Design a protein with these regions (language model features):
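Thiamine diphosphate
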Residues: 1-127, 153-155, 224-227, 231, ...
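Flexible, low-complexity linker and terminal segments
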Residues: 124-354
Length: 354
């Protein structure tokens, strides 16, 4: 349930078109009168397991809405996330981000809303990853007891692709994690202080453990003699790989010149072990992300207590002198990213193409 809005303007149309198939799979599509009522209905789906007369072990729920709809539904997200999901249910919250305000009165970036609601979220970079991350997101929601956000942009959700579904039968790894007595899932007669304790002390850490076990964040390119690393996510990652191709840099060239690339699938909370291992031995980390800095702030915080002699320089929206590198007031493009990468590489690698 949810409410339509670009770039998710066609989602409900496709669900209506697939109504016969959905009914056969016992999937109910009930669009909301508005975003918050849709989110409330999805929250209600997690209560099924609490009913002793329930006919199902659990129900998974998907909420959808564009950026301003997330603003409207924040109270529901906060309460639903704090209450928790069902162990056999789970909730995926799909948000359409219009970074360039192409069909909105203001640009929108859902990252900070999800963080404020303490909702872990995933950022797919391709049509294929909508399937992969969607399945991972529901499994993460069941494991960690949280709602899981899911960023959709026009560059991914309003495109088409051929996806080989045979590769989606991957085994999802359930990590070892020490949960509190009684677990972290929804329960009857809960006390709000206890809800908040589970949220603050366990759920986010459980999400990070799940992300680490399932390789949601990963090294894409490595180098035996690393000097500079690029960290990116979602649409910006796809643009970054295109920019590197325009510069004539592939995995072999990157390994030779000391360039590493790290793809973040879960921008918040940023899983610390993987990103720290990636940053070891680097002179510089360039963070490429849409709109305001988000991963960049988390990375700087995680590396802050490293000794200065081993801590890499971290740049993104600004360079080390405070000058703009990747401005937040427009959408990024492969061309803009290519210029920034070329400028950061020229100190130790330059070619006619660059």
């Amino acid at each position: 349930s949810g409410y339509r809005g670009s770039p998710l303007g066609g989602y409900d149309q496709e669900l209506w078109r697939a109504k016969k198939w959905l009914k056969e799979q016992d999937i109910h599509f009930v669009p909301g009168v508005n975003e918050e009522l849709g989110a409330t209905a999805v929250w209600g789906s997690q209560h099924v397991a609490l009913n002793p007369k329930a006919e199902r072990d659990g129900v998974f729920g998907i909420w959808y809405g564009k950026g301003p709809g997330l603003d409207r539904a924040m109270d529901v997200l906060k309460h639903g996330n704090a209450a928790g999901t069902s162990a056999h249910g789970g909730v995926l919250a799909i948000v359409g981000d219009d970074h360039g305000a192409k069909s909105s009165t203001l640009p929108h970036q859902s990252d900070h809303n999800f963080q404020a609601a303490f909702v872990p979220f995933l950022a797919p970079a391709s049509v294929h990853e909508f399937v992969e991350y969607g399945l991972l997101g529901i499994a993460m929601s069941r494991f960690a007891g949280t709602w899981v956000g899911f960023k959709a942009t026009a560059d991914t959700v309003e495109t088409s692709a051929t996806v080989d579904l045979s590769g989606e039968n991957r085994g999802i790894i359930i990590p070892s994690f020490e949960f509190p007595d009684g677990g972290v899932h929804i329960r009857p007669g809960d006390i709000w202080r206890e809800e908040d304790t589970r949220l603050q002390r366990y759920k986010g850490f459980a999400a990070m453990a799940f992300a680490k076990a399932n390789g949601i964040d990963r090294v894409v390119w490595d180098s035996p003699k690393p000097r500079i690393g690029i960290v990116s996510t979602g649409k910006a990652f796809a643009d970054t790989m295109e920019a590197l191709d325009e510069l004539g840099i592939d995995a072999r060239v990157a390994a030779d010149i000391g360039l590493k690339v790290y793809k973040v699938g879960m921008p918040w909370p940023l899983e610390p072990d993987g990103i720290r291992a990636f940053a070891e031995g680097l002179d510089e980390v360039l963070v490429i992300e849409e709109k305001r800095e988000f991963i960049e702030h988390q990375l700087k915080w995680q590396l802050y207590n490293w000794r200065e002699s081993v801590r890499p320089r971290v740049v993104g929206k600004h360079d080390e002198s405070g000058e703009w590198l990747l401005s937040p007031d427009n959408e990024l493009s492969p061309g803009v990213i290519a210029h920034v990468i070329a400028a950061r590489l020229q100190h130790f690698h330059n070619t006619d193409r660059i």
